[in-house]
Amino acid sequence: MKSEDVKLGIERAPHRSLLRALGLNTESFQKPFIGIVNSFTEVVPGHIHLRQISEAVKEGINAAGGVGFEFNTIAVCDGIAMNHAGMKYSLPSREIIANTVEIMAMAHAFDGLVFIPNCDKVVPGMLMAACRLNIPSIFVSGGPMLAGRLRKNDQVSCVDLNSVFEAVGQVAKGQMTEEELLELEKVACPGCGSCAGMFTANTMNCLTEALGMALPGNGTIPAVDSRRTQLAKSAGQQIMQLIKDNICPKDIITPDAIHNAFSLDVALGGSTNSVLHVMAVAHEAGADFSLEQINRISDCTPNLCKLRPSGPYHIENLDQSGGIGSVLKELKPWLKNDARTVSGKTIGQLADAAPKADNKVIRFASNPYSPKGGLAVLFGNLAPNGSVVKRSAVAPEMMVHRGPARIFDSEELATKAIMGGKIKTGDVLVIRYEGPKGGPGMREMLTPTSLLAGMGLDKEVALITDGRFSGATRGAAMGHVSPEAAACGPIAALQDGDMINIDIHNYKLSVELSDEEIQKRLANVPVFEPKIKSGYLKFYTENVTSASTGAVFKD
């Protein structure tokens, strides 16, 4: 056992003395040491209840003959960090999470790890750490929040955080009163858990099942459901079996597992952020995978779910309809069914054991919403290295669009123009210098897209950015444009009025300019000057790579 480095031999007497100070006895030193990587915090609704999850994990570890040690890492709430300087720190927190877990696991010689994430950057940060450390590991998330219930005119409707973001646009356009907004604000987020739709956090927790790193139910069992606590206890027990069998993350997260994750992703219509994060996980796992492969998967994999923001359903509905297992069951013809999972069974075996889909929340593969998946990576002279769009959330009339560019060099400038009613039907908003380096931190453009949707412009206006979008974004929103403006990508050459062509059906994103004109303009673009010159974001700006490679650090 790896933990023998801190507990066996005469020279480890000082180490054992310190461990005895924790309450361990001689018998404890014969057992595997398990690190419980918690991300509890009192400022994130998705993480406020994770102490309960951790206690259940400890029970499972103890019952199976191990010794559990809980430690924490950080967690950022993207909703609270949205639309101010805090959003610059959200994506960069992913690398901090991976690094802190690496430090704690190596310093204390754990034999295995149980990861307890829930929200956006915590899941991929922990997955990256698991691959980097490559010791037996298992994930159990905190689970999704229930949808809120809003009573209006004797009718009750389901609402969520995205409802509030879009309502701000309705208020700005005079379609909702501030009093009505307040009533919505009070009920949209009814308690603990990751925000209730197929937003980034829930996308990543669902994909963790398809990657093989979590037990069935991880992605969909609600945070307040007792099955969530039972799942946590089972994860604590299962880590002991993984240690016994010496099954490590790189045995599980292979190119086949990445294929399965993206197959599930496009079937669900998951968040565009998943592309960024799964590519980063693949990088840490040494699993070679390209953006072009995502399009090949999406071309042949049906879109089976319309979950918020793409449709009316929430994660609790997905769970009631069979959960991720039922989706995988429909996807079996497109999966790498022999891929391993932490359950000890293959992904195909788990799919076989799942209940049949209901053909409502989870459609049959023979009756999909679309024969093609919900995500697409667009290429062209505006995005030579790719740009990501959630096509399942794009209105049919915007799948092909041609319009004049409206250039904004920050999210704030674009938001001001939208709120001021200065955006016209047909416009293509371009928000640049918001990429990994340029932002820095690749902020989410949820406020601009929510305002457009709330004002009813999501079927008339497109938005392109080298920044990111929230999983709650809907509309013709193309993000992750690579290379970014700060790296002198073609997006930096755009001027107001340039005609932009979007063809999601054929994976194209281009500007009606010759290559010579683009290069001529780029030659006159000033050298990018970092916006932040101290602290962690200075380090981040100097070391982060392109969104097309997952925005990981330079090797």
Curated annotation (Swiss-Prot):
Gene Ontology MF annotations: 2 iron, 2 sulfur cluster binding; dihydroxy-acid dehydratase activity; magnesium ion binding
InterPro entries named among the record's database cross-references: Dihydro-acid_dehy_C, DihydroxyA_deHydtase, DiOHA_6PGluconate_deHydtase_CS, ILV_EDD_C, ILV_EDD_N, IlvD/EDD_N
Binding residues for Mg(2+): D78, D120, K121, E444
EC number: 4.2.1.9
Cellular component terms (Gene Ontology): cytosol
Active site: S470 (proton acceptor)
Cofactor detail note: Binds 1 [2Fe-2S] cluster per subunit. This cluster acts as a Lewis acid cofactor.
Residues modified to N6-carboxylysine: K121
GO BP annotation list: isoleucine biosynthetic process; L-valine biosynthetic process
Cofactor list: [2Fe-2S] cluster; Mg(2+)
Reactions catalysed: (2R)-2,3-dihydroxy-3-methylbutanoate = 3-methyl-2-oxobutanoate + H2O; (2R,3R)-2,3-dihydroxy-3-methylpentanoate = (S)-3-methyl-2-oxopentanoate + H2O
Pathways per UniProt: Amino-acid biosynthesis; L-isoleucine biosynthesis; L-isoleucine from 2-oxobutanoate: step 3/4; Amino-acid biosynthesis; L-valine biosynthesis; L-valine from pyruvate: step 3/4
Domain of life: Bacteria
Residues engaged in binding [2Fe-2S] cluster: C119, C195
Alphabetized UniProt keyword annotations: 2Fe-2S, Amino-acid biosynthesis, Branched-chain amino acid biosynthesis, Iron, Iron-sulfur, Lyase, Magnesium, Metal-binding
Subunit annotation: Homodimer.
PANTHER family given in the database record: D-XYLONATE DEHYDRATASE, D-XYLONATE DEHYDRATASE YAGF-RELATED
Family, per entry: Belongs to the IlvD/Edd family.
The protein's role, per its UniProt record: Functions in the biosynthesis of branched-chain amino acids. Catalyzes the dehydration of (2R,3R)-2,3-dihydroxy-3-methylpentanoate (2,3-dihydroxy-3-methylvalerate) into 2-oxo-3-methylpentanoate (2-oxo-3-methylvalerate) and of (2R)-2,3-dihydroxy-3-methylbutanoate (2,3-dihydroxyisovalerate) into 2-oxo-3-methylbutanoate (2-oxoisovalerate), the penultimate precursor to L-isoleucine and L-valine, respectively.
Name of the protein in question: Dihydroxy-acid dehydratase
The species this protein was found in: Dehalococcoides mccartyi (strain ATCC BAA-2100 / JCM 16839 / KCTC 5957 / BAV1)
